Design a protein with these regions (language model features):
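C-terminal catalytic and target-recognition region of SAM-dependent MTase-like enzymes
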Residues: 7-21, 25-27, 48, 67-140
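Conserved P-loop NTPase nucleotide-binding/switch module
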Residues: 29-40, 76
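Short, functional N-terminal and low-complexity linear motifs
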Residues: 23-29, 54-59
Length: 140
């Protein structure tokens, strides 16, 4: 795996990755079971700012997923605004329209005994020509 921390690398890897995992920065509200006082430390401005950062990260890093490739967007938050709503909003953007929503899963601490967590699986659409080329390469 490789951690990408510059936009230069994102441009270099444009549509090159088979799989991308975005472990997005988040409010961390999924770990309230272990840190119950965390909810009192959060400010509304922080949540607003973190949602903007999440949208930017999702839009930027999705560009390195090649057609037919998969992207996982994950947070340790239980807030829909950081999770389902963030993915839904992304899918309406210019780059987001190039992806299909496959599935998502929300893990809640009171149901699972684990920390709260969210993950969504998206797949970048590929044209029939791109799919044909990919299948041909796999055969060779």
């Amino acid at each position: 795996y490789r951690i990408i921390d510059t936009t230069k690398v994102i441009k270099k890897l444009h549509e090159k990755a088979d799989r991308v995992l975005i472990d997005a920065p988040c409010s961390g509200l999924g770990v309230l079971k272990r840190n119950p006082d965390a909810k009192w430390k959060l400010q509304p401005e922080f949540i607003d700012n973190i949602r903007k950062v999440q949208a930017e990260v999702l839009e930027s890093y999705s560009k390195i997923v090649k057609p037919g490739g998969k992207l996982v967007y994950a947070t340790c938050s239980v807030l829909p605004s950081e999770n389902q709503e963030q993915v839904k909003k992304f899918l309406t953007t210019e780059i987001g329209k190039q992806f299909n929503f496959i599935k998502d899963q929300k893990i809640l601490a009171h149901e699972s005994g684990f920390d709260g967590f969210y993950m969504a699986l998206l797949e970048r659409k590929e044209s029939s020509e791109q799919k044909e080329k990919r299948v041909q390469k796999e055969i060779e």
